[in-house]
């Protein structure tokens, strides 16, 4: 029987620590994704992070998918993360982290203040481009 992602998670963590040459004792904080995203995947990640936090006696902190995707970006950015039923979770960054859920098609009105034309394209970060949607 093949191992699933949940069963492989701790092996992947071990491999990442080995490649980075970091001992578990040096870990000071566990950071875990809290969504939006696949519900089962988020639950597995939270359970694994909580287990690591307890076993290593270190604090745990959650970060949402938009904060993780857009971390370190200074300009106006958009993340579009696929959701179920042909929906996307849209998130923007321009000093805050607003999140919106919209069907494929026109973007929420909150994007009206985005940069226009080439400046918008240059500064755009879109995730989940496997589906078509319009930001006009």
Model-derived regions, located:
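Phosphate-handling active-site elements
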Residues: 20-25, 54-65
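Oxyanion-binding and handling regions
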Residues: 6-7, 61-136
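Short active-site-proximal "capping" loops at secondary-structure junctions
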Residues: 2-4, 35, 122
